[in-house]
């Protein structure tokens, strides 16, 4: 099983989508994003992990997916099943998606 590990030297890419959502729709958005990730995204070539974070004030949802390559992200975004969930999410909230690489990671000293 893959898990989320954030490193600067592994060549992975992150697709981070920050949604602005009305607090009474945050749970619905989280359910939609979780269903899409479970049914389609996690099975796509190059997917390492998908994490869905909800803000405590109910106004944001962060969708954090790690990928092996930019090509894997692009291929996934072209999948009609993925597009369905992307469109459904956009009906519920304002998305702001971008691809990222890790610049630095910091851990506390033990």
Predicted feature residues:
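Short, well-ordered amphipathic alpha-helices
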Residues: 34-38
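An amphipathic, aromatic/His-enriched active-site/gating alpha helix that lines ligand/cofactor pockets
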Residues: 39-48, 66-101
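Short, surface-exposed ligand-recognition loops at beta-strand->loop->(often short) alpha-helix junctions
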Residues: 20-33
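Short amphipathic alpha-helical segments, especially helix-boundary/capping motifs
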Residues: 11-15, 26, 46-47, 61-63
